Amino acid sequence: MDKNMTLITTPSTQTSAPNTLQEQALMHGGQLSNMAQRYQIEEKDWLDLSTGIAPIAYPVSILPSACWQRLPQHNERLLQAARRYYQTPNVLPTPGSQSIIQMLPQICSTRGFARSKVWLPKVGYQEHRKAWQKAGYQTIDYTDINELDQIKPKDIVLLINPNNPTGALYSKEHVCQLLEEIHSKQGLLIIDEAFMDATGQQSMAQELGRRNRAISNRALSTETSSSSDYGHNTDKSDALIILRSVGKFFGLAGVRLGFVLASESWLSAMSSSLGPWAVSGPAQFVGERALTDYRWQEEQCIVLTRLSSALETVLTQAFAQPVHGTSLFKTVRTPQAPAIFEALCQQGIYVRLCDEKDALRFGIPHEQGLKRLEDTLHTAPLQQLLLPCS
């Protein structure tokens, strides 16, 4: 791998995860009911910035009654919409990416990776770590992609790109180099691209699609199926699994819809594990329309860029520390993170205290919410916490 490989943005490197499952569950964002009860503030009075979900949701029309009455069917229209959106032929709808995160370790153990070591970003979405460790895998932390030149044969590498919560984004060219090295060692690269939609030019989905199409063309030309080769990991596409989320960019977290992009053999194994009727009829209906509404997607990118830039300006003015993130969240590392989190909660503003407890992640608010956040950050209690340490 290129030793001079660099990040588009710089990741954080702090450690220290929550000590108990109860604490870890509490640390997840999106638990507004719990916060309302804890601070005795009604839910309607909170400004919830605890998630990385877009503040503008894709507009959902009235759903046909058949969506509710019939069992979910194989939906070719949804598949075609996903193939066009992600620019790859092999896609599998899932009830959110979390379901695949939880089942991936078991699937990998049946496909020649039972004794593999798993490389995980030291700072990142902790559900990945929970799943692999629960399945008994040995995990190794890394802080920078350059450290991955130490991987051994059959190792599994988990890349969160862009990273949640640091916002670190590796370029597609650099990830392609990493894939080459992992493939040469018969390993597996899993990329969580849940926050990739607004920076889709850096996604590996199109590269995966190119490789999968090449395999299909080769199979047709030789009249020999390539599926028998998958177990031996002879094609680079079989060394790559990509997880995508519909909930974040489209503001549809409650729909519970995601996609896995991978080779046919990986998708077959995951489909079997998911079982029948995995994705609800309403989710299929909404997902198909959201993925094909290209004009709305373009407008969403523009709006998110504007709102996220405005948030970054407010945070930069309030904090002495640099602000990093994506168009769906901004993160600030500060030693006062727990105290600032508590002070904001007392004012009915719910942000994400990161697992290492040395950073705060802010979801993107509307203009009115941003004004409330800005005003709160300028109050005396917050100003005392935000002053740089002398």
For every predicted segment, state its role.
Residues 75-117, 125-126, 130, 134-135:
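Phosphate-binding glycine-rich loop
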Residues 2-4, 171-173, 347, 355-390:
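PLP-dependent enzyme catalytic core of the Aspartate aminotransferase-like
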Residues 238-315, 319-322:
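PLP-dependent aminotransferase class I/II
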Residues 204-247, 267-269:
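Conserved active-site segment immediately N-terminal to the catalytic lysine
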Residues 305, 312-347, 364:
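Conserved PLP-binding catalytic core of the aspartate aminotransferase-like
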Residues 140-202, 224, 232:
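Active-site phosphate-binding strand-loop segment of PLP-dependent enzymes
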Residues 2-81:
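N-terminal "arm"/small-domain region of PLP-dependent enzymes with the aminotransferase-like
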Residues 48, 93, 321-325, 352-354:
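Short beta-strand
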